[in-house]
Structures are given as C-alpha cells and as structure tokens.
Design a protein with these regions (language model features):
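GST-like domain detector, emphasizing the conserved glutathione-binding G-site
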Residues: 1-82
C-alpha cells in the first residue's frame, strides 16, 4: 500500500479511528484538513473534494500513487485491516 492521504478533522471521532488504525499499522500517511459542510476551498462540499468523495463526508482516504479513494470510517477500517 502506498502512502495515504487522510482527509478530515482531527477532532472528528471517525477520523481519529482511521488515524489510530494507520498509526498502529505503522502506515505512512499525510493529513489534509477538510471543513465538513463548507462549500469553499478546503470544504467537504467543494467540487475538488466531491470529485474524490461524492458523498462529501469525512473521513476519506486517498492512495497517493494510484488515486484510489474510499470514504466512510467503517469501510476505511475494513480496507486497512486487510
């Protein structure tokens, strides 16, 4: 698995769950802050973010090399456990 980008806010419990899973797996990642519900740059309703995650929710991860994206904490945690 290549380096991951985690989109979200650190004070969001689902984002923290994903971050903890990555830390426990010693998987390198980069955190990009996304403001939930905001339609401006850096917001979850901005077209750039909606192109990655059409549901506009956090957390969302992206594989830096392949561009593969996945949203929803449960789906992400299942993916990371494999």
């Amino acid at each position: 698995m290549s380096k991951l980008i985690v989109y979200g806010l650190p004070f969001s419990q689902p984002v923290r769950a994903v971050v903890w899973a990555l830390l426990l797996k010693e998987q390198p990642f980069e955190m990009k802050l996304i403001n939930p519900g905001h339609s401006g740059k850096g917001g979850s309703r901005h077209p750039d973010f909606l192109a990655k995650n059409p549901s506009g929710t956090i957390p969302c991860i992206e594989e830096a090399d392949s561009g593969f994206t996945l949203g929803e904490a449960h789906a992400i945690l299942t993916y990371l456990s494999q």
